């Protein structure tokens, strides 16, 4: 930020508000460090208003944003740009008896009143992540169970509280852990101190030994399950999706999203054993697997001495993998690292192997493909555990209330803006999983949440959120209402002038491709 302090700046983003108003504060501060003052005063003025909407507060925030923030929505340019549709397919599956037993055992364990394996200050967050890994695959949860047992072993031998490498291990598998941890801490009340780990008695040590035994039994059961029902259904889901793409005339390409790197590796092996050998590429935070390194080396060699190479290994690695997916691979298996910052409009099939509870994250995923430049309707495949009542209710909310999987616009800004934050919504879902034990309790809890959402997505709320999120420039639609053919001709004339000037000045220093109106220095 300091290096650009005195330079004119334009920040372009498709997702200015995701999980928190503090993201807005951060973006605005890059443009104008004095727009909102310090972060404490901003939080005091606006953060609490996010959960208790106040027309006057939102109007004030809107006025303060006007000088630095302009927004154009799809609906405002729909008559000038042909946006494609999105359509949903559901792949249902039933877990095997062994998978169901593992789920029940771990779920019951997480619902215990007292757990030693989870750091006291992170109990809620760790419980949410463990449930996400449990839903992802037996491979994802088994590694984490092993680490938790190891943490307890350390506590028993040293009688000293400690993390025991839990943070590092979970963040290596569940890549959004650090980000989620920061969001959860940010979402807590200001001034709330983290609880200290207690000192342990001999009685505690005995209970720890019993907990270690239970965790190791869970781990043993998880490792004994070599095939997952959901994984076995993946091939069927892909073929259904590819059949739909063929009908649409789209390329046979799919991106599969998972929240776990262990699950990612399991899916790679499964697909390569089922006819997709040599057609799969991985995308994750580190991108340090042998195949990715090979792709990167070949890409650098191919594009050396061109402006495609940025000099940033991280950025170039991402570009290399995306290019490989476009030109060579059929399937990309990605973690949340691919949900931001890459453009995949050449791909028309999105598979949510794991479905996040945060609707804003889902919208980000689908937005990689369902974006400007996409020529075909985007097919979105979601997996649904028919033996899990809570999973079915979550999908119902995401599909029917947030409208994430169908239509031209997907989840509208009014609807995504109606929840306090993506983090808060995740917490609400996690609480239902944690507190409800019977299908009746689950039904009641989700009905209450749905009722709240219906109230929050009322006409009054829509109007308030629209004023904040959309109408920074109320004349934008009128400004765009010009004759389309005239505007094309007008642009064409000036583009040709610019092209001819460029060729004149760079004629000796660049290779020009006239048919594509592009050049390489």
Give residue ranges: language-model regions.
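Conserved RecA-like P-loop NTPase helicase motor core
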Residues: 272, 277-391
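Signature of the SF2 helicase/ATPase Hel1-core->accessory helical subdomain module
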Residues: 1-49, 339, 346-364, 368-378, ...
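Conserved Helicase C-terminal RecA-like lobe
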Residues: 83-95, 141-328, 478-516
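C-terminal accessory region of SF2 helicases/translocases
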Residues: 376-521
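Loop/turn-to-beta-strand initiation segments
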Residues: 6-10, 253, 328-331
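Inter-lobe coupling linker of SF2 helicases/translocases
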Residues: 1-6, 29-168, 390-454, 458
């Amino acid at each position: 930020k300091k290096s650009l302090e005195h330079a004119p700046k334009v920040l372009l983003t498709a997702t200015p508000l995701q999980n928190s108003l503090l993201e807005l504060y951060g973006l605005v501060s890059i443009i104008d460090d004095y727009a909102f003052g310090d972060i404490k005063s901003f939080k005091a003025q606006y953060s609490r208003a996010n959960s208790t909407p106040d027309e006057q507060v939102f109007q004030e925030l809107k006025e303060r944003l006007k000088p630095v923030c302009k927004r154009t929505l799809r609906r405002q340019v729909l008559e000038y740009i042909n946006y494609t549709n999105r359509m949903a397919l559901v792949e249902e599956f039933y877990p095997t008896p062994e998978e169901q037993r593992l789920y029940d055992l771990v779920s019951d364990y997480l619902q215990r009143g007292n757990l030693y394996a989870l750091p006291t200050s992170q109990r809620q967050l760790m419980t949410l992540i463990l449930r996400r890994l449990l839903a992802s695959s037996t491979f994802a949860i088994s590694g984490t169970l092993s680490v938790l047992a190891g943490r307890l072993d350390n506590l028993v031998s040293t009688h000293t509280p400690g993390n025991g490498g839990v943070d590092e291990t979970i963040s290596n598998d569940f890549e959004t852990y650090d980000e989620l941890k920061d969001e959860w801490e940010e979402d807590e009340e200001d001034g709330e101190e983290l609880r200290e780990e207690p000192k342990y008695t001999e009685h505690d040590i005995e209970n720890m030994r019993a907990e270690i035994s239970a965790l190791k039994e869970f781990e043993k059961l998880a490792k004994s399950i070599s095939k997952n029902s959901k994984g076995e259904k993946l091939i069927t889901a892909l073929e259904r999706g590819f059949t739909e793409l063929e009908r649409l005339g789209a390329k046979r390409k799919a991106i599969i999203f998972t929240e776990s790197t262990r699950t990612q590796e399991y899916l790679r092996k499964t697909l390569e054993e089922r006819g997709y050998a040599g057609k799969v590429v991985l995308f994750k935070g580190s991108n340090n697997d042998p195949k990715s390194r090979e792709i990167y080396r070949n890409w650098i060699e191919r594009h050396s001495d061109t402006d495609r190479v940025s000099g940033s290994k991280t950025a170039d690695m991402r570009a290399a993998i995306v290019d490989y997916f476009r030109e060579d691979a059929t399937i990309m298996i990605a973690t949340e690292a691919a949900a931001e910052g890459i453009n995949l409009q050449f791909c028309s099939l999105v598979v949510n192997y794991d479905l996040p509870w945060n609707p804003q994250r889902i919208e980000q995923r689908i937005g990689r493909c369902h974006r400007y430049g996409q020529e075909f309707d985007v097919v979105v495949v979601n997996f649904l555990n028919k033996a899990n009542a809570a999973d079915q209710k979550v999908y119902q909310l995401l599909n029917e209330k947030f409208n994430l999987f169908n239509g031209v616009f997907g989840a509208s800004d009014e609807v995504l803006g109606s929840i306090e934050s993506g983090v808060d919504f995740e917490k609400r879902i996690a609480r239902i999983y944690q507190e409800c034990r019977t299908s009746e309790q689950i039904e009641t809890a989700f009905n209450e949440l749905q009722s709240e959402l219906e109230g929050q997505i009322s006409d009054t709320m829509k109007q308030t959120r629209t004023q904040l999120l959309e109408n920074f420039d109320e004349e934008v639609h009128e400004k765009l209402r010009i004759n389309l053919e005239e505007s094309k001709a007008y642009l064409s004339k000036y583009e040709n002038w610019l092209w001819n000037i460029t060729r004149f000045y760079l004629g000796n220093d660049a290779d020009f491709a006239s048919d594509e109106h592009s050049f390489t220095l």
